[in-house]
Amino acid sequence: DGATFLLCETKSMDSASRKIVLEMIQLLNSKEVWIDRIHHDEIISITSHLPHLISTALVGTAKDNYEINEIMGMAAGGFDGATRLTRTNPEMIKDMYDTNSENINKFLKYFLDELMDLMDLQERDELISYLNNSVHWRRALSEKFGERPLS
């Protein structure tokens, strides 16, 4: 209820098919957003697929370096929030990767470059500036669209 459905037209889509989809969305009290398939795949790789892989990598880093009791004895909201996506069905993650690997790999490389840039920040002021830019952007996102509950 109230969800947004991102829809991509295909060459084979006719007006009857489109009408059925729109009626289903209306029955769910949701809204539709039509988006180009290529643009959709790029954005979804950042907003959905990449977070799953980052979450999984963080779990792998913790698992490979510490015993579970050590991690859980010290883990708090940050670890829980950052690794929540790792509970997702692995088959679904594999399917996401298989269908969008080109975009995922492109933005995974960009993400790795961001991490390397972060590691290179030696001056406190540089780090504060980097963090402030991210905080301001994320807060603006929340102000514009609100906070969604964690599920």
Task: Describe the predicted segments one by one.
Residues 132-151:
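Short, amphipathic C-terminal "tail helix"
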Residues 37-44, 48, 128-132:
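An alpha-helix initiation/capping motif
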Residues 32, 43-79, 83-84:
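Substrate/ligand-engaging "lid" and interaction regions
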Residues 1-35, 41:
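Rossmann-fold dinucleotide-binding core
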Residues 53-56, 88, 117, 140, ...:
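Amphipathic alpha-helical interaction surfaces
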Residues 68-138:
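Interdomain hinge/lid region at the active-site interface
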